[in-house]
Amino acid sequence: LCCPPQXCGPDCASPCC
């Protein structure tokens, strides 16, 4: 999982931006 402030990208399970 990758959400702000971590930001989003290909390493994220879902586009939470």
From Swiss-Prot:
4-hydroxyproline modified-residue sites: P4, P5, P10, P15
Tissue: Expressed by the venom duct.
GO molecular function: toxin activity
First-listed, main subcellular location of the protein, grouped into a coarse class: secreted
The keyword Disulfide bond appears for this protein: yes
Paired cysteines (S-S): C2-C16, C3-C17, C8-C12
Subcellular location(s) per record: Secreted
Keywords: Disulfide bond, Hydroxylation, Secreted, Toxin
Superkingdom per UniProt: Eukaryota
Domain comment as written in the entry: The cysteine framework is III (CC-C-C-CC).
Name the record gives this protein: Conotoxin Reg12b
Organism: Conus regius (Crown cone)
